[in-house]
Design a protein with these regions (language model features):
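Conserved acidic donor-binding segment of nucleotide-sugar-dependent glycosyltransferases
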Residues: 292-303, 311-316
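Conserved donor-binding/catalytic core segment of Leloir-type glycosyltransferases
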Residues: 7-9, 160, 166, 172-190, ...
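Glycosyltransferase donor-sugar binding loop
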Residues: 38-45, 183, 208-221
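Nucleotide-sugar-dependent
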Residues: 255-269, 281-288
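Nucleotide-activated donor-binding/catalytic signature segment of Leloir-type glycosyltransferases, i.e.
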Residues: 56-58, 221-239
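C-terminal amphipathic helix plus adjacent low-complexity
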Residues: 332, 337-443
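Short hydrophobic beta-strand element within catalytic cores of glycosyltransferases
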Residues: 40, 273, 277-280
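A short, active-site helix/loop in glycosyltransferases that binds the activated sugar's phosphate group
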Residues: 115-121, 125-155, 162-164
Length: 443
């Protein structure tokens, strides 16, 4: 039997999405239906390369998005599975491949509601099928404006989940303090801005907050020191084995800022598998994962969030009940078999359709491609309006008021990655992007 060929394309291969991708591809690889291979436009980290060698799955990394050999590979494969988030190399690939025929499915690893990770018509129209990782994404404005026939043909939703991965086998480790834990991105681009203040306000004796992850843990640690609560908080930075820390958590507190880009929230699933009650805000994908009052609490305010933590501290029987419910719910809903079956169904659906022309947004010959891709990916938001206004002054100075507006933008727009100006400027040698970069350094 000749296997059909599926080609996965990802901006880079590593981190949280990398773990989900490895689990999915490996389990698809074990089936007889499709041969799997992966192209990473940027890097594949050592963990991914070791995984590739151990399992006989080909990885090609540092592949140029404009390389004709990649375009030919995409045209020759039966299914092209693109893993989406705002990354300059991915946008460059979609633009440069436009006009060619293949069968594309895009799986979004961002929820699409907030800049710089907004969905847009160019992204939604490019594939034959667009797959979200959370039902929260189905309420995004560029999806809801489409008619029901279009959505029925082109929109699907499959949770981002790497399976139980023995997180359900974690046994609690005895400890002397009441441990409230967080794992994941430690950066205000994702975490609630009052993260430290909320923990400090919770009236819990003998408490230890264990914050696992990076990359801004050092600056947040210094903030806790300045606020006089460093004795309550332990920042670990990135760790190689998160299970060791989950074994010591009594409660999993996951307060994200409202406009975060998350989707499947794999760390929530891991906590649930381990039987740790979860506390989240009623914003975005988190409330689609946590079963309010059953596996944990979904809070509508900072006050409710703190009260939920205090309630779990003071009620041992409730914690045990929610722990058991969490394990049960995870085993029923988050095994890897479910997404594997869903993906095979989508692959078969794609095979039933002929290869079609992929059309991306066209730009005028007078438009600057790098800047146009950056602004397209950024979408309709305050940052985009400010940058467009600044560019009207290029290459001269801009009014002070406009500079100050740029300086007041959230940190995510001025970071080194995540679709920021610096991110695009690092891949495109472009004077206008370098000009815009100046205003990100004024914060």
């Amino acid at each position: 039997m000749n296997k059909k060929k599926a080609l996965h394309i990802t901006p880079h291969f590593g981190g949280g999405v990398g773990s989900v991708l490895m689990s999915l591809v490996l389990n698809l690889h074990k089936r007889d239906d499709f041969e799997q291979e992966i192209v990473s436009l940027e890097y594949a980290n050592e963990k991914a390369k070791n995984w590739s060698n151990a399992n006989g799955i080909k990885i090609y990394d540092k592949v140029s998005p404009v390389d004709n050999r990649l375009h030919e590979k995409m045209q020759n494969r039966d299914v092209v599975h693109i893993h989406f988030w705002n990354h300059p190399l991915l946008y460059q690939l979609l633009y440069s491949f436009s006009g060619r025929k293949t069968r594309v499915v895009i799986w979004s690893h961002v929820n699409g509601h907030y800049a710089p990770y907004l969905f847009n018509d160019a992204i939604l129209n490019f594939p034959e099928i667009f797959v979200t990782t959370t039902n929260f994404s189905l309420t995004q404005k560029d999806i809801t404006k489409r008619n029901s026939d279009w959505k029925s043909r082109h929109i699907r939703s499959i949770p981002s989940c790497s399976g139980l991965n023995e997180f359900d086998k974690i046994e609690p480790v005895p400890h002397d303090t009441f441990n409230i834990g967080y794992t994941g991105t430690v950066d205000y681009c994702k975490i609630h801005p009052d993260f430290i203040e909320m923990f400090n306000k919770a009236d819990i004796p003998n408490v230890q907050y264990i914050i696992v992850g990076g990359d801004s843990h050092k600056s947040m640690e210094e903030e806790a020191r300045v606020k006089g609560c460093i004795n309550k908080l332990k920042f670990t930075g990135k760790v190689s084995n998160v299970k060791e820390y989950l074994a010591e958590f009594d409660v999993f507190a996951y307060p994200l800022q409202r406009e975060n880009y998350g989707t499947g929230e794999q760390v929530l699933i891991e906590a649930m598998c381990a039987g740790i009650p979860q506390v989240v805000f009623a914003d975005g994908p988190e409330e689609y994962v946590v079963q309010d009052g059953i596996t944990g609490f979904v809070a509508n305010s900072k006050k409710e969030f703190i009260e939920a933590i205090q309630k779990l501290y003071s009620n041992d029987s409730l914690r045990r009940k929610m722990s058991a419910a969490s394990k049960k719910y995870a085993k029923e809903n988050f095994t890897i078999d479910r997404p594997v079956k869903s993906w095979l169904k989508i692959y078969q659906e794609l095979l039933s359709r002929p290869k079609s022309e992929c059309i991306f947004r066209k730009f005028e010959s007078t438009e600057d491609l790098a800047v146009s891709l950056f602004l397209l990916a950024l979408g309709e938001c305050d940052a985009s309006s400010i940058y467009k206004e600044i560019l009207q002054y290029y290459p001269d100075d801009v009014p002070l008021e406009l500079s100050e507006k740029a300086a007041r933008l959230p940190q995510i727009f001025n970071g080194n990655t995540r679709g920021s100006i610096k991110h695009y400027s690092s891949f495109f040698d472009n004077e206008k992007l370098k000009y815009l970069e100046i205003f990100g350094t004024l914060q």
